[in-house]
């Protein structure tokens, strides 16, 4: 009995800290992450989950050599700033004020904040959102609004 209890305590303690998954680089979203922007090489994508109520942070790392010739992180920032003006997805620069990006920053919201950080050689694309709102339930509400002829964001906390 003691050995079994000890094994359960060790297992439970593993769930206290954040855990990374998708380590084999076969994450189910990689295909769409390549298809939608037209990437020829899949990015490195290994999300991290943790035991807290809501919120999620995802990141995709890029090397400058993966960009079109002559393009830089500043070009990505400019494209994000032009494209993601809200209310559902908003670009923020800098991503955070204190050097730490919290996965819970958008908890309770049905919107998403995207950012670009890094340097001239290594670029990090990040998104922060509430996985409960911006996920399936938010999408269901957007679809319902579309069918009912309402504004897409009706009933969402953007």
Locate predicted features:
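Substrate-binding strand-loop-helix patch
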Residues: 31, 51-55, 68-71
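Short Gly/Pro-enriched turn/cap motifs at secondary-structure boundaries
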Residues: 21-25, 48-51, 102-106
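Oxidoreductase and adenylate-handling cofactor-binding alpha/beta cores
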Residues: 30-43
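Short, solvent-exposed beta-strand edge segments and adjacent coil->beta transition regions
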Residues: 16-18, 55-59, 122-124
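C-terminal active-site/capping subdomain that shapes the small-molecule cofactor and substrate pocket
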Residues: 61-158
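Single conserved hydrophobic/aromatic residue that forms the stacking wall/gate
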Residues: 1-10
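Active-site-proximal loop/hinge segments within enzyme catalytic domains
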Residues: 11, 44-63
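Glycine-rich active-site loop/strand segments that organize a redox cofactor
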Residues: 11-24
């Amino acid at each position: 009995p003691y050995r079994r209890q000890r094994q359960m305590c060790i297992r439970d303690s593993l769930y206290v800290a954040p855990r990374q998954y998708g380590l084999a680089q076969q994450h189910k979203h990689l295909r769409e992450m390549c298809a939608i922007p037209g990437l020829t090489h899949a990015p490195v994508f290994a999300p991290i989950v943790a035991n807290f109520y809501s919120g999620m942070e995802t990141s995709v790392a890029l090397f400058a050599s993966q960009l079109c010739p002559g393009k830089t992180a500043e070009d990505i920032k400019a494209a994000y700033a032009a494209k993601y003006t809200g209310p559902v997805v908003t670009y923020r620069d800098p991503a955070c004020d204190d050097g730490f990006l919290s996965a819970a920053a958008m908890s309770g919201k049905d919107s998403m904040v995207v950012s670009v950080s890094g340097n001239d050689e290594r670029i990090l694309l990040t998104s922060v959102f509430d996985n409960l709102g911006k996920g399936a339930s938010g999408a269901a509400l957007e679809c319902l609004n579309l069918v009912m002829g309402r504004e897409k964001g009706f009933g969402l906390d953007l």
